[in-house]
């Protein structure tokens, strides 16, 4: 098989010290994008404070539901793939993914890689996911999206229930209309929905990907 530097390092350390260093064994049948759910990805997840068992179970549940489905309508994964293929058939080649939480930025780029390694890799005519520039520069996203006939599909990605939120308390009189408002709900009402409606009114296609809750289950699925 392929040379593995870490394997060679472990072997040499054992030979020279008489002690085998601790290691995580990886199933040789797991590679590529599927490595996310092997020790390659899950060790990092644990270091971040995530429950790897919960993430693996959530991903397995999605796969089992897909295998058990008798039709596209019975599988969420199949419906998402079918929609993606349909968009391409309608002449919409690029899906621009705009995230509304910093915690999504790295994940959004990873999703683009997963997309390229699945439908796109097998030659299926499906959209190309273009990760947005991120929350710190949404005005650049808007400059691109507001162009007429840009053939872009806007995907808005946000938490349904973030792990942390803030409800505005009484402060300055000029801010009284914000008292009692959740920052997250304000973001949804005043930016996400408003932008989506504007683009739809201008004949653009908008998809909302709402992750119900900020936890391992929904993050993995």
Model-derived regions, located:
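Helicase-primase coupling helices
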Residues: 129-213
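Short, intrinsically disordered, charge-balanced linker/junction segments flanking boundaries
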Residues: 215-221
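Active-site phosphate/pyrophosphate-binding segments
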Residues: 2-154
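Residue-level detector of flexible, active-site-proximal loop/helix-junction positions
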Residues: 30, 213-215
């Amino acid at each position: 098989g392929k040379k593995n530097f870490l394997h060679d390092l472990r072997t040499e350390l054992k030979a020279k010290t008489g002690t085998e260093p601790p290691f995580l064994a990886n199933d040789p049948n797991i590679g590529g994008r599927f490595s996310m759910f092997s020790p390659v990805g899950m060790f990092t997840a644990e270091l971040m404070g995530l429950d790897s068992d919960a993430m693996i179970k959530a991903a397995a549940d999605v796969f089992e539901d897909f295998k058990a489905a008798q039709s596209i309508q019975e599988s969420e994964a199949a419906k998402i793939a079918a929609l993606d293929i349909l968009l391409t058939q309608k002449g919409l080649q690029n899906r621009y993914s705009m995230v509304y939480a910093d915690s999504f930025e790295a994940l959004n780029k990873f999703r683009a890689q997963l997309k390229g390694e699945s439908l796109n890799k097998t030659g299926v005519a499906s959209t190309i996911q273009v990760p947005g520039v991120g929350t710190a520069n949404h005005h650049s996203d808007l400059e691109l999206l507001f162009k007429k006939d840009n053939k872009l599909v806007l995907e808005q990605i946000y938490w349904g229930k973030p792990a942390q939120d803030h409800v505005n308390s009484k402060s300055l009189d000029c801010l009284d209309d914000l008292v009692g408002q959740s920052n997250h709900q304000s973001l949804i009402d005043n930016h996400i929905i408003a932008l989506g409606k504007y683009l739809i009114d201008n004949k653009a296609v908008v998809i909302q990907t709402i992750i119900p809750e900020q936890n391992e289950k929904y993050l993995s699925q």
